[in-house]
């Protein structure tokens, strides 16, 4: 600003000296006044004012642009490193790091023990590739791994993951890997590759990330142009494009930072080493007991704890008992009737026929001949005896015809009811 002022000062002096009029009297000076000097002074003042305003504006805008470009460069660098920086959380997390004991309690593992596609995998803090002999520290909640020195230095000042910005909580992290032998393998004192646990890595493909960014709307015009180009291609170009796509599928690029390590505590290398023969015998006995219980007392297992179903089972059992009692009564009645008829027939036959003259047919209660005894009984007496015997047989047959259908229907009704109850219970068991 001062340089510009000193630059215009000689010009102003020379112009003023050139415009100085010859000495006049006081009256002539007032009469012959020319406003050229005032105009020049006003123009120069305006120029100086505009110059000053422009300098101030340029200085302020230059500071803002420089600070904005610096923030943008820092933001781009953090994005390249995979750290999504948040200004609101940066100030709060800067001095809210974890304790040293908490950091040292985080699990460790060797990079060579990791299974899966681990080629080109980098540490998102120092941007260097992992080596097979290096020991990495795992954040159990988000399952991201880093170098020990990198993550320890980071966690001293921040309580979040440098990759996904997820907060590291020791209470939640300790509950993730305390199932069985998981935390034992990942402990610092037992870092080895022959453990029963297996570590797998899940990585995001670079194509998926690009596709997700395209779907967000940032490159929708380029997508439309690429589709138009593909539609305009001929058969030869399409075949070349297909070959290029196939080669690209064979050589899929994995993202360097977006990964997730899965700890598998289910797949064991020596999973049968701790099983003894007594355990197998106990297992077999338990299987036999369960099968036998399911076979012989399936209703009890299905209806256990349900009072209504137990009452229904008791009712079925009572009905079965009543059915058995009815059948027993019917059989006893039939046997009684048959025995009474047999006794009456035998008595009549003993009166009619002498013991020495009885035949086989008389023993079987089917008399073929009606023989008079001692000639005292006439033919009418024999006819009356045979009529009595036939009448007893007819009453027995009538009773059988009357009771047997009733007993058969009753037994069939109880049997059908029992079958229906069993079918319903089995259907309920399968539905459960």
From Swiss-Prot:
One BP annotation, GO: protein ubiquitination
Start-end of RING-type zinc fingers: 123-165
EC number, UniProt record: 2.3.2.27
Enzyme type, top EC level: transferase
Compartments reported by the entry: Membrane
CDD domains: RING-H2_EL5-like
Annotated GO CC locations: membrane
Membrane-spanning residues: 37-57
Swiss-Prot/TrEMBL catalytic activity: S-ubiquitinyl-[E2 ubiquitin-conjugating enzyme]-L-cysteine + [acceptor protein]-L-lysine = [E2 ubiquitin-conjugating enzyme]-L-cysteine + N(6)-ubiquitinyl-[acceptor protein]-L-lysine
Metabolic or biological pathway: Protein modification; protein ubiquitination
SUPFAM superfamilies: RING/U-box
Cysteines paired by S-S bonds: none
Keywords: Membrane, Metal-binding, Signal, Transferase, Transmembrane, Transmembrane helix, Ubl conjugation pathway, Zinc, Zinc-finger
InterPro entries in the record: Znf_RING (IPR001841), Znf_RING/FYVE/PHD (IPR013083)
PANTHER family linked to this entry: E3 UBIQUITIN-PROTEIN LIGASE ATL42
Function description: E3 ubiquitin-protein ligase able to catalyze polyubiquitination with ubiquitin-conjugating enzyme E2 UBC8 in vitro.
Domain free text: The RING-type zinc finger domain mediates binding to an E2 ubiquitin-conjugating enzyme.
Family the UniProt entry places it in: Belongs to the RING-type zinc finger family. ATL subfamily.
Designated name of the protein: E3 ubiquitin-protein ligase ATL42
């Amino acid at each position: 600003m001062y340089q510009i002022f000193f630059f215009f000062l000689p010009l102003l002096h020379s112009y003023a000296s050139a415009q100085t009029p010859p000495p006049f009297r006081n009256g002539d000076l007032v009469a012959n006044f020319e406003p050229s000097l005032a105009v020049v002074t006003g123009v120069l003042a305006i120029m100086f004012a505009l110059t000053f305003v422009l300098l101030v504006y340029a200085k302020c805008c230059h500071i803002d642009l420089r600070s904005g470009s610096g923030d943008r460069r820092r933001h781009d660098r953090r994005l390249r490193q995979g750290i999504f920086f948040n200004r609101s959380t940066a100030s709060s997390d800067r001095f809210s790091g974890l304790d040293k004991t908490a950091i040292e309690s985080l699990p460790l593992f060797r990079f060579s023990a990791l299974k899966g596609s681990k080629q080109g995998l980098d540490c998102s803090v120092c941007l260097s590739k992992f080596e097979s002999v290096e020991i990495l520290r795992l954040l159990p909640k988000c399952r991201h791994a880093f170098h020990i020195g990198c993550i320890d230095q980071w966690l001293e000042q921040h309580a979040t993951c440098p990759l996904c910005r997820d907060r590291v909580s020791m209470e939640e992290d300790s509950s993730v890997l305390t199932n069985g032998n998981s935390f034992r393998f990942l402990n610092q004192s037992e870092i080895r590759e022959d453990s029963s646990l297996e570590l797998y890595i899940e990585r995001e493909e670079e194509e998926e990330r690009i596709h997700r960014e395209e779907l967000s709307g940032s490159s929708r015009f380029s997508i439309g142009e690429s589709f138009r180009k593909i539609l305009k291609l001929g058969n030869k170009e399409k075949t070349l494009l297909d070959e290029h796509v196939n080669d690209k599928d064979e050589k899929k690029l994995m993202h360097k930072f977006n990964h997730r390590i899965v700890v598998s505590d289910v797949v064991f290398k020596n999973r049968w080493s701790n099983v003894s023969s007594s355990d197998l015998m106990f297992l077999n006995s338990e299987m036999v007991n369960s099968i036998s219980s399911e076979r012989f007392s399936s209703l009890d297992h299905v209806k256990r704890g349900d009072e209504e179903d137990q009452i229904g089972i008791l009712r079925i059992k009572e009905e079965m008992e009543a059915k058995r009692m009815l059948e027993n009564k019917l059989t006893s009645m039939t046997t009684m009737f048959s025995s009474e008829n047999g006794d009456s027939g035998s008595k009549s036959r003993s009166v009619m026929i002498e013991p020495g003259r009885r035949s086989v047919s008389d023993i079987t209660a089917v008399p073929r001949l009606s023989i008079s005894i001692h000639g005292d009984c006439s033919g009418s007496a024999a006819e009356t005896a045979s009529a009595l015997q036939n009448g007893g047989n007819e009453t027995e047959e009538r009773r059988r015809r009357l009771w047997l259908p009733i007993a058969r229907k009753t037994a069939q009704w109880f049997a059908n009811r029992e079958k229906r109850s069993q079918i319903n219970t089995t259907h309920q068991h399968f539905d459960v």
